[in-house]
């Protein structure tokens, strides 16, 4: 197995996952197909996705443990992933199958990617019970690890459990990471997704990501809504699976990129989208037979999910994934709250986020979220130990970019030469020394508002100087000789 990373932004990756039946471009979603009843033909799913997931436990029960060609059963010729029945444990408490047997069964029926049978639990599980289930999952994972070479080239997923207990998540992630699985997965997020607790779910992902092998593919079970996908990808999730497309369709729920509509709530003659479904009059949709409507809405939902993943991939290539998160975060308060809190994980995000992209784009910063982004923190950490060539600082607020091409800077340098160190005051980065002004993205950005953290950094940095001359900048300091300049020519009075 090989996982090749093509492009990065934040902790998100565009990559290629090689399986025995083909290559998956990530981020990728596996639509769930029920082997007991296919409500949407495989040919329809294949128009939008080149991979599916089905429940090996259901197949096991249907055949009495007899191996069948699962791809032939489902009329599917591309990459196929199987789950082991863990979701049924979450819902009903147990399944009647041995963990080792169901893993071997997945290989025998021709699965390209299989999952060990872990013990999932929801986020309300008491700590003592959660600890026991994590320990049992690790024991099962160790047994599965010993079988990896005997599973007919099937890639195997190691789920990481822990609920909202961060110590259990970290322990589980570290232990599972040692066992040689091809893919890791975040377990038991379903309840959080159902309750729109996106902020808690994303925090779980961050803690898992911090404790697994850096380059390993990461799967998120049960996530299939366009709102959560870009955030999960930004934190390092590569693979998803979901039955949301068909579950929503059964209830006449129609996915859009930023929300979900119920058919009964649509007031316009047509839906506000551009898929095949959206060209049908709403009145006609309401009057058609329910089964026919399910198929149409399900196909529409698949199309919307595909659109979302394509947008995410393009954003990663551009290096504008954060800007996309800014847009999506306004769709739900928990997403907005999480985006603002990402500064707590700045070191982790900065570690994964590439400094440059093949095709750089100007970045957009907003006052309420700028402090959470990795770029300002990277600048502050790097300039903290930068040599200061003079004990006299001139701080100017220049409007033209790059800053060291502005007329103010060029005129100032003609007056003082190297007798003072020129710094540019930036509302996001704080102070930008003249010698690094053209480094991306210090001059390649647009900002709205001023970051308090940037101002705090400016005060800290200015402690390196004995005399501070300010031009069009308000930075009062009691402990320093701070002199506001009415014009640039006034600088000659002090140097």
UniProtKB/Swiss-Prot annotation:
Name of this chain's protein: tRNA-guanine(15) transglycosylase
Q: MF terms per GO, please?
A: pentosyltransferase activity; zinc ion binding
Q: Which organism is it from?
A: Pyrobaculum aerophilum (strain ATCC 51768 / DSM 7523 / JCM 9630 / CIP 104966 / NBRC 100827 / IM2)
The reaction(s) annotated as catalysed by this protein in its Swiss-Prot or TrEMBL entry are: guanosine(15) in tRNA + 7-cyano-7-deazaguanine = 7-cyano-7-carbaguanosine(15) in tRNA + guanine
Q: Which SUPFAM superfamilies match?
A: Pre-PUA domain, tRNA-guanine transglycosylase
Enzyme superclass (EC): transferase
Q: Which gene encodes it?
A: tgtA
Q: Name one GO cellular component term.
A: cytoplasm
Cite the InterPro entries for this sequence: ArchSynthase1/Queuine_TRR (IPR050076), TGT-like_sf (IPR036511), TgtA (IPR004804), tRNA_ribo_trans-like (IPR002616)
Q: Which family does it belong to?
A: Belongs to the archaeosine tRNA-ribosyltransferase family.
- Protein EC: 2.4.2.48
Q: Which residues bind Zn(2+)?
A: 273, 278
Which cofactor does the UniProt annotation name?
A: Zn(2+)
Q: Which Pfam families match?
A: TGT
Free-text comment on the cofactor: Binds 1 zinc ion per subunit.
Record pathway: tRNA modification; archaeosine-tRNA biosynthesis
Q: Which residues form the active site?
A: 83 (nucleophile)
- Where substrate binds, per the record, is at 118
From the record, give the transmembrane residue ranges.
Answer: none
Q: Does the entry annotate any disulfide bonds, and if so which pairs?
A: none
Record GO biological process = tRNA wobble guanine modification
UniProt function note: Exchanges the guanine residue with 7-cyano-7-deazaguanine (preQ0) at position 15 in the dihydrouridine loop (D-loop) of archaeal tRNAs.
Q: Which controlled-vocabulary keywords does the entry list?
A: Glycosyltransferase, Metal-binding, Transferase, tRNA processing, Zinc
């Amino acid at each position: 197995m090989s996982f090749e990373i093509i492009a990065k932004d934040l902790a998100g990756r565009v990559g290629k996952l090689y399986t025995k039946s083909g290559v998956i471009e990530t981020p990728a979603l596996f639509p769930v197909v029920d082997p007991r009843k296919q409500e949407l033909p495989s040919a329809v799913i294949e128009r939008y996705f080149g991979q599916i997931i089905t429940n090996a436990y259901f197949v096991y029960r249907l055949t009495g443990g007899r191996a069948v060609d699962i791809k032939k059963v489902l009329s599917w010729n591309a990459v196929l992933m199987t789950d082991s029945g863990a979701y049924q444990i979450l819902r009903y408490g147990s399944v009647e199958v041995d963990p080792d047997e169901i893993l071997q069964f997945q290989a025998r029926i021709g699965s390209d990617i299989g999952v060990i049978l872990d013990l999932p639990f929801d986020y309300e599980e008491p700590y003592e019970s959660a600890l026991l289930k994590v320990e049992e999952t690790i024991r099962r994972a160790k047994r599965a690890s010993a079988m990896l070479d005997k599973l007919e080239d099937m890639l195997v997923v190691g789920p990481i459990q822990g609920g909202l207990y961060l110590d259990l998540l970290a322990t589980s992630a570290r232990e599972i990471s040692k066992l040689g699985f091809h893919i890791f997965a975040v377990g038991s997020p379903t309840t959080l997704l159902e309750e729109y607790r996106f902020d808690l779910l994303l925090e779980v992902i961050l803690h898992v990501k911090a404790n697994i092998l850096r380059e390993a593919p990461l799967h998120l079970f049960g996530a299939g809504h366009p709102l959560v996908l870009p955030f999960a990808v930004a934190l390092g999730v590569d693979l998803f699976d979901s039955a949301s497309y068909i579950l929503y369709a059964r209830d006449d729920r129609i996915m859009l990129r930023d929300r979900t509509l119920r058919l009964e709530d649509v007031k316009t003659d047509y839906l506000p989208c551009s898929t095949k479904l959206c060209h049908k009059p709403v009145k006609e949709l309401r009057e058609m037979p329910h089964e026919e409507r399910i198929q149409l809405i399900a196909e529409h939902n698949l199309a919307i999910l595909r659109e979302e993943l394509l947008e995410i991939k393009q954003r990663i290539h551009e290096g504008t994934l954060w800007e996309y998160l800014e847009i999506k975060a306004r769709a739900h308060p928990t997403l907005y709250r999480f985006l603002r809190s990402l500064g707590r994980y700045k070191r982790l995000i900065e570690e994964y986020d590439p400094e440059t992209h093949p095709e750089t784009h100007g970045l957009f910063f907003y006052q309420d979220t700028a402090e959470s982004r990795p770029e300002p923190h990277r600048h502050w950490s790097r300039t903290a130990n930068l040599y200061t060539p003079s004990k006299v600082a001139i701080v100017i607020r220049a409007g033209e970019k790059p800053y060291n091409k502005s007329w103010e800077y060029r005129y100032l340098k003609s007056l003082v030469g190297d007798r003072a160190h020129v710094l540019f005051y930036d509302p996001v980065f704080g102070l930008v020394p003249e010698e690094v002004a053209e480094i991306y993205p210090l001059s390649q950005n647009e900002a709205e508002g001023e970051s308090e953290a940037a101002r705090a950094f400016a005060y800290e940095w200015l402690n390196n100087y004995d005399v501070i001359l300010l031009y069009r900048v308000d930075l009062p300091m009691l402990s320093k000789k701070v002199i506001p300049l009415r014009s640039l020519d006034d600088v000659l009075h002090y140097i």
